[in-house]
């Protein structure tokens, strides 16, 4: 009998119920792959009391984490944080405070550091009122008061707590004897003649963002708050010293006055915006540009005082972090600045935790912009955490397995091993610096796109101003970190720090060449690598067989073109050309142009080479207008379907007037070649033919425009101010004929007397002219689009390499060391482009000789270049000018007998 069911046993509804658990039945559901959630940027805002910070975090799309979470991408705290917390941060995290910033944010520390800097550079730090720190400087203050009494002068002083805030404990005195001697106070001279607005005293709250201290990066927010007093200002006297609503502009003080005006607009009330204030200055005929320039200079000089302290503390917190890596710290600072009646800014104090309260609408508008734009500038990415963890893992494995890129040198190493070791270290140093430069360029591009209302004030774009600030930085390190100033000075003066990517690549290439020499490899010759279009240096490619020339020399008496190609080549060529549409094969649309290589050096070859070029003048389909080998600047400006013009209207610059013999030979060759064009069909691939035709057309156009550029460059001349072309050429020839006499003088002038900025300005005479001419030849809006101009830029950088050694080496016997930059370049340089570069170098050499001669003859400045030259491109001391003489082309077919005009390439010439 069947057994009865027991409790807990699941029974099916029938003997064949599919719901019963059979041993062979699969009850697992098919797994559905869930979409991976996108990365989320997290923020810990437990340390702030301001609601505007949380609102901006939400607006940025960040996710707020629990208060105890210490792994967030962003950590925001109102108060200063301990250095241990910064040490524990991962590289992907950001926190809104720098260690060591208290050196300028505490009133007593700011006064002490400013006093030291004033002793070193008194002319640069004139924006801080005279200050005494009590009790240590009580005696000096009393001596100063006694000197005033002897001169029968009386001044007002403002007394502040050493570490106070929000206006607490501030008072005004006129009798120095009343100041307590043992309290920790700050005593400053009171600015009695401030700039007034509607009769009220006011100060400015300027917001500053520091995104990095290694290297230093400072941004100024072009808006802020104007905080006004609430009683009409009267110069201080014994009767009104206690009226703080008149003399103090702090919001925390004046908001308690019944006369405090709260207004929803930015142009009324006791609190207004700096944006409105700049409009007010402009309406009253004040120099707004100078106002912002003075503010920026004050901010940068103040943060230069803090930089030695901040950088030292930051590196102590992050000991394993290489220089130039992304900073885990940033800071929004509030500068309180007072304007005197001459609009000179005076620094009052700096707040490292400025208030982000939003009592009024103007507070919300200004402070929201400050925070929102600051977070955008930080460029916090969702991938930062993942990349950081992967980097840590790779670094741990490298340490575990001892995978050091540079092997240690044993004590008994030979000279050869020591040289190899030095080269390896040099290459690693260059690679690290190259990586840093590329990161900095990428970061600057992001900053330029997301600055919003911020402006970068350090490093400035003005090179002269940057040199001035760097000099102040050196003084600051010497003043505050005398024990470690030498190491910081060496780091700042490292020549690699100022090199660009192209210069570093050139140095890496040089290291590899030296390494190959050391290893005994002689396979690669220093200099430009053999190009595929040099017949004597490379095998003949299929494309050259079809459309190129043979290795036989050109015979002017020969009238038949069939002897230049063998039968197999002609058959292959005919098969390819057989598939060309009728419109392309027709004699009215196809013209064969022959140019001997000796004419204008179009082919870089020692043996004469004959070049046959097919120029198709009919309309190409859209799919054939763009080729992989076609530069963007060419393909972007090819004629469209509706823009096809007849050959008579096409813009061509003749390179030379052909002789009658060569013209007849060209016509005979064209007719002979046309007779061999087949009219049947072939089974070959049409796509292969179209690709060949596209490459042919774009390469022909590029070569033609490069030939025109070479022709223009050869016709350019450097003109001595006040002399004719012939006189200028005679002057250059005289220097070269007497080179033994001039060599040491020119070397001293170029390599010693001219700094890097002025060396660049000398070459800018040539560079600016070429930059003006190229867009008109290539028909592009900007020369930066051209691959040829990028090649020129590499040549200019090479000439300025190693403080001008690149150009000076061109005066040696070989004079072609600069060509080594193309030996390992991934971009193929054609012979025409190489000839353009050679002419470019020749113009730069002539330009240096003319500038040197002008300086010696006119007894100009020792540098030969006036301070205003950079603004006018060509202007030298006085009213004279260097002229780049070049023909005035209108890009039409002109007869060779036409006269050409001399032009100075400036912005007033809109077209050629």
From Swiss-Prot:
Listed cofactors: Mg(2+)
InterPro entries: TTL/TTLL_fam
GO biological process terms held by the UniProt record: cell differentiation; nervous system development; protein polyglutamylation
pH dependence: Optimum pH is 7.0.
Binding site for Mg(2+) 2: 349, 351
Compartments where found: Cell projection, Cilium; Cytoplasm, Cytoskeleton, Cilium basal body; Cell projection, Dendrite; Perikaryon
Tissue-by-tissue expression: Highly expressed in brain, testis and trachea. Expressed in brain, heart, kidney, liver, lung, muscle and trachea. In the brain, highly expressed in hippocampus, thalamus, olfactory bulb and cerebellum cortex, corpus callosum and striatum.
Gene3D superfamilies given in the database record: ATP-grasp fold, B domain
Catalytic activity: L-glutamyl-[protein] + L-glutamate + ATP = gamma-L-glutamyl-L-glutamyl-[protein] + ADP + phosphate + H(+); (L-glutamyl)(n)-gamma-L-glutamyl-L-glutamyl-[protein] + L-glutamate + ATP = (L-glutamyl)(n+1)-gamma-L-glutamyl-L-glutamyl-[protein] + ADP + phosphate + H(+)
Keyword set, alphabetical order: ATP-binding, Cell projection, Cilium, Cytoplasm, Cytoskeleton, Developmental protein, Differentiation, Ligase, Magnesium, Metal-binding, Microtubule, Neurogenesis, Nucleotide-binding
Compositionally biased residues, Polar residues: 659-671
Keyword Flavoprotein appears in the UniProt entry: no
Protein residues bound to ATP: 160, 166-167, 188-191, 201-203, 249-250
GO MF entries: alpha-tubulin binding; ATP binding; beta-tubulin binding; metal ion binding; protein-glutamic acid ligase activity, elongating; protein-glutamic acid ligase activity, initiating; tubulin-glutamic acid ligase activity
Role this protein plays: Polyglutamylase which modifies tubulin, generating polyglutamate side chains of variable lengths on the gamma-carboxyl group of specific glutamate residues within the C-terminal tail of tubulin. Mediates both ATP-dependent initiation and elongation steps of the polyglutamylation reaction. Preferentially modifies the beta-tubulin tail over an alpha-tail. Competes with monoglycylase TTLL3 for modification site on beta-tubulin substrate, thereby creating an anticorrelation between glycylation and glutamylation reactions.
Entry's free-text remark on domains: The enzyme uses its core to engage the disordered anionic tails of alpha- and beta-tubulin and the flexible c-MTBD (cationic microtubule binding domain) region to bind the microtubule and position itself for beta-tail modification. The c-MTBD region is positively charged and becomes ordered when bound to microtubules: it interacts with a negatively charged patch on alpha-tubulin. The presence of positive charges in the c-MTBD region is essential for proper binding.
Family (UniProt): Belongs to the tubulin--tyrosine ligase family.
Name of the protein: Tubulin polyglutamylase TTLL7
Organism name: Mus musculus
Taxonomy of the source species: Eukaryota, Metazoa, Chordata, Craniata, Vertebrata
